[in-house]
C-alpha cells in the first residue's frame, strides 16, 4: 500500500485556484446531453467521477471533445432522451453523482441499461429514487439486493403525474428526479416525504436547470412543480465553479496556520452551499474575507462550535479535523448521511480521530470531538474515501506530522490535492 508522509508545517501562505465542482460538472454534463445544441463546459473537473460519467455518455453515443488537460468539454446535445437498440452495461465506479442521475435519465428513452459499480457502490442506497421513478411508470429491476445497485432499467419513457420521494437520506435522489422531470409525458409534481437533507445541493440543481432553460417551482422544499413542454436548450457556454468542498481544506489551513490563504473559483456569487463552510470557520474565530469569486482565510486562535451541519455535509468533515486545533469540544450535528457516502464517514472519522489522541463521541447522526493536549502522529486509513485523505492532511499542522495511507484515493475529485497542499507550506 502506498503511504504519504506529511512532515510538520509551521505556516501556510498563498493562492489556490480550486478545480471544478464535482456536483456541478456531472450535472452539467447530463443536462448538456439532454439539451438541444452544443455546450462548451469550462473548468470541468478532471477526476475519476467525471471520467465515469464521460465514458458512459460516450458508450451511449454522445459526441464530445475534451481539451488536452480535460478541463474544457465541447459536447453535442441530443435534445432528446437517451436511447439504445442494444443492451448496455455501464460501470460507474463509486460515483454517486453519475449513478443516481443516469439511473433516472435512462428511464426516459427506450432500451435496456444495466448500471454497476465498485463493491462500495453496492452498499450505497438508491431505493428512494427507484421507488419514485416506479411511481412514474419506470421499469427498474435490482440484480442483487433490493434498494441498491447493480440494477437494470427497461426504459419506455416516464409518465406525468404526482410523485413522492423521501428526502431524508440523500439530496441526490431528488436532484436526479428533478433533472429528468421536464422530459416526462406531462407535468410532474414532486412531494418530499420527511425532512429534505442537503438543501443547498438542490439549489445547485435548480440553478443549472434554469441555465438550460427549464424552470422549477420550489414550494419551501416540500413540493416541486415542473411544467411539461420545457425542453433543455444549451446556453452555449457553462463555467463550472470551483469545488467549494475542495476549497474547505485550504480555508481551514489558513485558519489553523495562516498566514493568509486565498482560494479562487468560489466566493460570494457561488451557487454551492458548501461555501458556508467559511461562515463556520468565522464562528470558530478565523478571519474571513469574501469576494465575488474568492475567499480569503487568515489564521487566528480557534474555539469549538456546536452546530447543525446538515446543509454542508461534505465540508463539515473538514471541521472534524480542524476541531483538533480548537479550544473546547466541537459538536457536528444532523449528519446521518455521512454514513452512506464513499464509506461510513461517521465511523471512519471517529476511528481515525482517536488514533491521533482525540476524545470522540460518535452518535447515530452526530460526532463530538475533544482535541488532545497535543495530537500524536499515526498512520491514517482513508477507506478509499477522497475526503478522509484530504481532511487528515490538516494533521500536518500538528508538531508531529501525519502519514496518509492510500493518498491516491483523492483522484475521485482532486488528483493534484497533495501537490497543491504542499505548495502552501512556508
From Swiss-Prot:
Catalyzes the transfer of the enolpyruvyl moiety of phosphoenolpyruvate (PEP) to the 5-hydroxyl of shikimate-3-phosphate (S3P) to produce enolpyruvyl shikimate-3-phosphate and inorganic phosphate. One of its GO terms (molecular function) is 3-phosphoshikimate 1-carboxyvinyltransferase activity. GO terms for cellular component: cytoplasm. One of its GO terms (biological process) is amino acid biosynthetic process. Disulfide bonds: none annotated. It is an enzyme of class 2 (transferase). Phosphoenolpyruvate binds at residues 22, 96, 124, 172, 345, 387, 412. Belongs to the EPSP synthase family. The lineage of its organism: Bacteria, Pseudomonadati, Pseudomonadota, Gammaproteobacteria, Alteromonadales. The active site is at residue 314. CDD domains: EPSP_synthase (cd01556). Monomer. Its main location: cytoplasm. Its EC number is 2.5.1.19. This is 3-phosphoshikimate 1-carboxyvinyltransferase. It catalyses: 3-phosphoshikimate + phosphoenolpyruvate = 5-O-(1-carboxyvinyl)-3-phosphoshikimate + phosphate. Keywords: Amino-acid biosynthesis, Aromatic amino acid biosynthesis, Cytoplasm, Transferase. Pathway: Metabolic intermediate biosynthesis; chorismate biosynthesis; chorismate from D-erythrose 4-phosphate and phosphoenolpyruvate: step 6/7. It is found in: Cytoplasm.
Amino acid at each position: 500500500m502506498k503511504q504519504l508522509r506529511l512532515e510538520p508545517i509551521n505556516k501556510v501562505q498563498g493562492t489556490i485556484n480550486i478545480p471544478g465542482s464535482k456536483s456541478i460538472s456531472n450535472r452539467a454534463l447530463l443536462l448538456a446531453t439532454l439539451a438541444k445544441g452544443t455546450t462548451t463546459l469550462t473548468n470541468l473537473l478532471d477526476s475519476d467521477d467525471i471520467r465515469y460519467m464521460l465514458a458512459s455518455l460516450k458508450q451511449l453515443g454522445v459526441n464530445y471533445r475534451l481539451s488536452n488537460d480535460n478541463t474544457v468539454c465541447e459536447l453535442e446535445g441530443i435534445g432528446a432522451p437517451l436511447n439504445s437498440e442494444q443492451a448496455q452495461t455501464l460501470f460507474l465506479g463509486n460515483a454517486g453523482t453519475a449513478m443516481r442521475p443516469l439511473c433516472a435519465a435512462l428511464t426516459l428513452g427506450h432500451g435496456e441499461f444495466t448500471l454497476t459499480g465498485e463493491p462500495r457502490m453496492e452498499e450505497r442506497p438508491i431505493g428512494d429514487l427507484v421507488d419514485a421513478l416506479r411511481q412514474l411508470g419506470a421499469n427498474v429491476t435490482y440484480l442483487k439486493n433490493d434498494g441498491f445497485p447493480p440494477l437494470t432499467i427497461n426504459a419506455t419513457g416516464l409518465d406525468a403525474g404526482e410523485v413522492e420521494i423521501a428526502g431524508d437520506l440523500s439530496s441526490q435522489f431528488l436532484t436526479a428526479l428533478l433533472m429528468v422531470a421536464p422530459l416526462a409525458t406531462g407535468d410532474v409534481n414532486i412531494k418530499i416525504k420527511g425532512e429534505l437533507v442537503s438543501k443547498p445541493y438542490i439549489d445547485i440543481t435548480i440553478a443549472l436547470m434554469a441555465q438550460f432553460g427549464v424552470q422549477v417551482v420550489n414550494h419551501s422544499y416540500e413540493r416541486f412543480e415542473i411544467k411539461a413542454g420545457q425542453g433543455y436548450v444549451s446556453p452555449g457556454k457553462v463555467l463550472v465553479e470551483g469545488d467549494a468542498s475542495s476549497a474547505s481544506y485550504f480555508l481551514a489551513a489558513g485558519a489553523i496556520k495562516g498566514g493568509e490563504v486565498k482560494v479562487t473559483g468560489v466566493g460570494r456569487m457561488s451557487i454551492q452551499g458548501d461555501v458556508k463552510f467559511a461562515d463556520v470557520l468565522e464562528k470558530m474565530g478565523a478571519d474571513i474575507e469574501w469576494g465575488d469569486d474568492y475567499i480569503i482565510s487568515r489564521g487566528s486562535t480557534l474555539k469549538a462550535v456546536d452546530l447543525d451541519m446538515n446543509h454542508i455535509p461534505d465540508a463539515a468533515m473538514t471541521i472534524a479535523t480542524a476541531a483538533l486545533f480548537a479550544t473546547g469540544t466541537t459538536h457536528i450535528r444532523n449528519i446521518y448521511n455521512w454514513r452512506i457516502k464513499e464509506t461510513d464517514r461517521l465511523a471512519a472519522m471517529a476511528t481515525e480521530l482517536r488514533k491521533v489522541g482525540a476524545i470522540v463521541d460518535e452518535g447515530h447522526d452526530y460526532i463530538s470531538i475533544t482535541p488532545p493536549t497535543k495530537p500524536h502522529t499515526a498512520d491514517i486509513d482513508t477507506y478509499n474515501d477522497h475526503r478522509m485523505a484530504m481532511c487528515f492532511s490538516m494533521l500536518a499542522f500538528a508538531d508531529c506530522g501525519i502519514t496518509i495511507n492510500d493518498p491516491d484515493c483523492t483522484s475521485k475529485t482532486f488528483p493534484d490535492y497533495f501537490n497543491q497542499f504542499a505548495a502552501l507550506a512556508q
